[in-house]
Amino acid sequence: MKTKSLVLAVALGMCASMSAADIVAVYTKKVDVGTEAHHPTLSPNGDVVLFTSENYTGLKSINLSTQEVSVIDETPKAGFNPRFTADGSEVVYRTSIKEDGISRDDVRRYSFVSKGKAQIMKHTKDVINTSSLVAETYAYGLVDKQAIEVSVNGVKTEINPIGYGYRYLWASISPNAEKLVFNEVYSGLFVSNLDGSQAKFLTSRGEFPCWVDDKFVVALSTKDDGYVITSAKIIAIEVATGKITELTDDSVLVDGLAAVEDKIVYTTEKGEMYVMNILINE
């Protein structure tokens, strides 16, 4: 049996369900960033984590190998959906200002080599897709158009995998560029072919979906009382079978996660960041 190691972020006191054949081991590590951490983003090689405040003000990074924390920007919205370049040496992100009551975003680029940043796009009221500025292959939910923009090697198409009139979020392409996972606001988490065909329902609650390889997706499964989130735990889904494995329990409220290859990092409502290693058998 081939054993594949996946590194996941998790909170202390959590446990994995060993009844699922794919999970064989787990341990937990807390990452001390010296402040509250929310909305994590991982570099392509999994060495650096971007994080921000609960309301996305400011953008910081931590190198998981050296534990060095760096302040990238302190302006509003800087932590909303930042994107690494392919080699991980730079990050592209937005900041926000208000002019005459209208929010306007600009785009900035930060270098981890020079530790400097520069504005690469002036403030505009238009919607900015940072993914398109760092990659030619990506997927992006166009909420206003009720579609998903899929770009493969720079060729862009708009698709509606489960039909028109839906609000698509958190679209992500599998590492082998064959599958697409996405969330629909009211319908849940789905997987489809890259052209949107053969869409398959995975679960009714699946926020922040991330591919850990070509076969497994992790996501946040939440519950609410109609007003606020009351519980949130990380689940792993085998996309071929739809089998769901709970990786954490309800003891800690998770508010964000990110995954790259063998690593997942997530944060809690208290602003804590954790790393958890598990083994998944294929």
Where are these regions (language model features)?
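Sec-dependent N-terminal signal peptides
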Residues: 5-14
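Sequence signature of WD/YWTD-type beta-propeller architectures
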Residues: 20-282
